[in-house]
Amino acid sequence: MPKGEPFKIKMVEPIRLIPREDREAAIKAAHYNPFLLRSSDVYIDLLTDSGTGAMSQFQWSAMMLGDESYAGASSYYRLKEAVTDITGYEYVLPTHQGRGAEKSAFAQLITRPGMYVLSNMFFDTTRGHVQLAGGRPIDLLLDVPTEEYHPFKGNMDTARLEAFIQEHGAENIACIVMTVTNNSAGGQPVSMANIRETSRIARKYGILLLFDVARYAENCHFIRMREEGYADKAPIDIAREMFSYGDGLMMSAKKDALVNIGGLLAFKDEELYTRVGGTVVPFEGFLTYGGLAGRDLEAMAVGLREALDPDYLAYRVGQVEYLGNLLRSAGIPIQWPVGGHAVFIDAAKFLPHIPWDQFPGHALTVALYQEGGVRTVEVGSLVMGRDPETGENVRSPFEFTRLAIPRRVYTNLHLEDVAETVINAFQKREQIRGVKFTREPKVLRHFTAHFDLV
């Protein structure tokens, strides 16, 4: 089997590692928040895999076909054809990115304040939009320790799901959201068996099941590799089965549609499409462009199919696993096995001297930038925010530092530099300090908050 990447590189972007004293000054000027750093001060950027990947020659050439008509553009119909072919959903709404899809959906599905939205685990923006719409997000993730092997750590705890529905009543639940892969749990996959059982429960109680499918192709790859009965199935066939169990989807296309901007909503039901479309039009744009240029729709249509290529998926997941193996062999505590898009360091174990409400995952992001110019992000109690009723910080089941790898961008030599940075920080971990707020926004606070070291 070939060991190289399944592509050649046609264009490059220079990067550099600025001196240590400049990194110290840059992160201080950014109020110890990596989101507020300038990209020119970052050596290797693992903040997110969202919109940071490299597009293919086929996507770039497709952009030349972009139809910029305000309504009924041919680019929309090419995108719709791709979405329907992969998902089986006939009713498709583009949005400017995933947040536009989330806002539009929850604005219609949460019909009164206090309704619950249940999930295997929400990501930050999804959780935020549930709350902004007046809903209450509830995580029902399968409980497995980070160091313990489980092939599908992203699974819904279906026993807890059904118990919650029975206790609170189906009429008080707006919908169920199945996140594939499960980003906040470490980019962990969800099994087809778990999706099927979640669908059965949703049907039993008459509750909508929506997929959050930013990384749907990676999830299909894990099913193919790890679940009995799927080894000989093509990723697109696995995707079609997966989507058959739901009522619709929300998507940030900036991940597994391999584009720099864009989002999607798609539904089986025309009535649901009409309701949600009523929010898309005033906030995103007309139904056939959703805030995007025609050229972006064209690139998305191509990328959705490219992401299901088995050679690409083997490379993609294999590169993440390569970094995970480098760290694990050095004794770094990580979520194991690694997920599809990122390595998640268990910051609570990496920095046991920092209490959870001083955000060890964020403290480690600061240290990794100072040590090697590597930008990462916290996925833990900082991202969880505050309880809207009590005002107290919500404690996450995980305190992660996420190293998200952009698609088709970095080589394994770059990842070796990342591993060296993490290992160096680990060797001086007792010197790493927690953080406290000096400015705390009320919603999605981690993006723009200011911090100081404790």
UniProtKB/Swiss-Prot annotation:
Gene Ontology molecular function = tryptophanase activity
Positions of post-translational N6-(pyridoxal phosphate)lysine modification: K255
**Which EC class, in a word?**
lyase
Q: What EC number is given for this enzyme?
A: 4.1.99.1
Do the record's keywords include Lyase? yes
Q: Which cofactor does it need?
A: pyridoxal 5'-phosphate
Give one Pfam family. Answer: Beta_elim_lyase
Q: Which reaction does it catalyse?
A: L-tryptophan + H2O = indole + pyruvate + NH4(+)
Alphabetical UniProt keywords: Lyase, Pyridoxal phosphate, Tryptophan catabolism
Please give the InterPro entries that the UniProt record associates with this protein.
ArAA_b-elim_lyase/Thr_aldolase (IPR001597), Beta-eliminating_lyase (IPR011166), PyrdxlP-dep_Trfase (IPR015424), PyrdxlP-dep_Trfase_major (IPR015421), PyrdxlP-dep_Trfase_small (IPR015422), TNase (IPR013440), Tryptophanase_CS (IPR018176)
Q: In which pathway does it act?
A: Amino-acid degradation; L-tryptophan degradation via pyruvate pathway; indole and pyruvate from L-tryptophan: step 1/1
Protein family (similarity comment): Belongs to the beta-eliminating lyase family.
Subunit description: Homotetramer.
**What NCBIfam families does the entry give?**
PRK13238.1 (NF009709)
Protein name per the record:
Tryptophanase 2
Task: Print the organism lineage.
Answer: Bacteria, Bacillati, Bacillota, Clostridia, Eubacteriales
Q: Which gene encodes it?
A: tnaA2
